[in-house]
Amino acid sequence: MDRVIFHCDLNCFYASVELLSHPELREVPVAVAGDPASRHGIILAKNEPAKQCGVKTAETIWQAKKKCPNLVLLPAHHKLYREYSKKVNAIYDEYTDLAESFGIDESWLDVTNTLHLFGGDAKALANAIRQRVKRELGLTLSVGVSFNKVFAKLGSDYKKPDATTVISRENWRSIVWPLPVGDLLYVGGAAQKLLGQYGVKTIGQLAACKKETLETLMGKMGTQLYEYANGLDSAPVRARLDAEPVKSVGNGTTFPQNLTTRIQVRSGIAVLADSVATRLRREGLYAGGIQVTVRDPAFHDRSRQKQLPAPTHLILDLTNAAMALTEELWTPPAPIRALTVTAIHLSPDGEAYEQADLFDPTAGQRNARQEKLESAMDAIRKKYGGDAIVYGAARPEKEGDPLP
């Protein structure tokens, strides 16, 4: 028997939450911006009227204003968004114990074993959930209904806002295969460009490729994308309540060439810290400590860890702390073969605290600016893929220094 999977996507989530406090702006173009006072701030979200004007997530404010001069800009309130996300998740949990969050505004629900309790009609249940969220919270959803997670997500993207799309065994080829290959889960900008070089523009063309060819071209990701395009995704929906609490978030890499200068090492650390910080923000976690492991060409590992002054999920904080630890373990020009950066002593964002800096009263303002910057980076990557933007500290400062 096929599974029944929903993918629920809150429409224009940030903007929709803001409009609950500004109902008078509901019919005018509105965008939530990382820094509304700056022309170079980034659009984090927009409502439907702004979307109809051509405003796009992750573009700069001046670009959006050029398209839509009467665009109303509102500041972001991330704590409020997390509160509404929890309220929506509480509704989902009443329909199944298999609900998996995918970011702050998306969730998969496996209702295979509970559908009979709500009438047995999948589309009717999806519509009922949409109507309940709208009635109780004032927010709208798009819901995809399908027999696997990948197609359910394609369904929620297929028709917006406030809609339900069913992708079934009978119709999936006619709906899915004509779509651009970039619509498929985990096909980022680099993968789309690579596939395009081989004439693969649609999901159907991807499905027609030989699995062995894709594996040669893209490694394990090629095999995975082949399965996704052919309706073979079997990944389970993982219940939030059953998930093991995350105790650490880390990333490590072996470099193509040994690192011997501080500039090279800081660039490598920044790349790793970027990955760690991005995941922390996605999981709603803060790091209370940092650990660094340094490996030399003889495969000798040395590690050190320390408590951070205050919990953080910011790239800059993690990069600075990890670099300081590395310099305790390493003296240039001794070669470094590999590095690992791990965030430890994690806490949910609601439990994190910020320690006042008595010697630097501007520290809070700097953190707020950095939070806006990294939120903008998250928005750009969500829209254009993980490789769409690189944190500046990950670039070499001196010409001739190789990138890690």
Task: Give a label for each model feature.
Residues F13, P36-R39, P297-H300, L346-D349:
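Short, charged/polar surface micro-motifs in flexible loops or helix N-caps
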Residues S107-N113, S303-K306, D357-P361:
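Short, hydrophobic beta-strand segments
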